[in-house]
């Protein structure tokens, strides 16, 4: 059930394809995933290490475990998306991500820190990116790559804004209040468009992907499916080679981003302000 009705969507669609509004919502989702991304945590690592008296090794271990657990739970989230649709799952994810920010800001020991990492990695870096991509792909077929490319700009903007803004919030309000602000801003940015504008797929409002006209010829409506299904893909060696490649790249980039501010502080004697601005693409 959607708060926006088919009539309103079609009125907007006469001026521009409604799928581009979905791309904007998806881009906001990718941007908001910054609350659970390594480039944001990097700004907080030096102050958390100092205030909680927890070593960088212990924090990175907790972060690694939280990331791996979140990754292995993502297929379950994918099933929820298939069952309930991306919109309701996105709304739930955003609500829980906001509470994850509040939980992380209240961390006073290693256990709470690890739990906060788990919340933020699963609902931010994992689920939010998954659902945002899913809802965009529902609205596009021939222009899917272009639409996903536009949506991906949200991540670049997040890399450019979240670290320096986080550093500013830490300096002005302290790291705990910074997480409260991030949590509430995530709700403010994402909940209104998801509640009032998001639609799972074009068929829900009597439309087709890419804004295509309806085809009455039954022969032409049959789409040709090319590729492998899940069970077939899992039997191919190339699947595991590609999966390992993406896994390795993600782990390397995560490690570098997570420690970037700390490394630049300690080994290059750069201030946190400069270190966080270096994330700007």
What is the meaning of each model-derived region?
Residues 95-108:
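C-terminal ends and interior cores of transmembrane alpha-helices
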Residues 18-59, 73-77, 162-163, 255-261:
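Extracytoplasmic
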Residues 31, 100, 111-127, 247:
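Hydrophobic core of transmembrane alpha-helices in multi-pass small-molecule transporters
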């Amino acid at each position: 059930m959607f708060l926006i009705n088919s009539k309103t969507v079609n009125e907007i669609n006469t001026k521009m394809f409604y799928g581009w509004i979905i791309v904007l919502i998806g881009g906001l989702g990718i941007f908001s995933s910054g609350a659970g991304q390594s480039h944001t945590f990097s700004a907080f690592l030096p102050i958390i290490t100092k205030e909680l008296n927890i070593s960088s090794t212990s924090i990175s271990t907790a972060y690694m475990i939280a990331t791996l657990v979140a990754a292995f739970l993502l297929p379950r989230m994918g099933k929820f998306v298939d069952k309930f649709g991306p919109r309701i799952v996105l709304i739930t994810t955003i609500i829980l991500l906001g509470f994850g920010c509040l939980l992380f800001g209240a961390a006073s020991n290693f256990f709470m820190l690890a739990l906060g990492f788990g919340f933020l990695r699963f609902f931010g870096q994992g689920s939010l990116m998954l659902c945002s991509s899913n809802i965009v792909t529902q609205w596009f077929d021939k222009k899917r790559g272009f639409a996903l490319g536009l949506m991906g700009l949200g991540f670049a903007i997040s890399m450019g804004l979240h670290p320096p803004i986080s550093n500013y919030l830490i300096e002005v309000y302290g790291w705990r209040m910074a997480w409260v602000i991030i949590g509430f801003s995530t709700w403010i940015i994402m909940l209104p468009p998801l509640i009032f504008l998001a639609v799972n797929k074009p068929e829900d409002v009597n439309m087709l992907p890419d804004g295509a006209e309806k085809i009455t010829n039954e022969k032409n409506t049959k789409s040709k499916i090319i590729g492998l299904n899940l069970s077939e893909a899992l039997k191919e060696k190339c699947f595991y080679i590609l999966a390992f490649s993406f896994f390795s790249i993600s782990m390397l980039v995560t490690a570098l981003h997570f420690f970037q501010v700390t490394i630049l502080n300690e080994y290059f004697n750069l201030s946190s302000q400069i270190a966080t601005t270096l994330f700007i693409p």
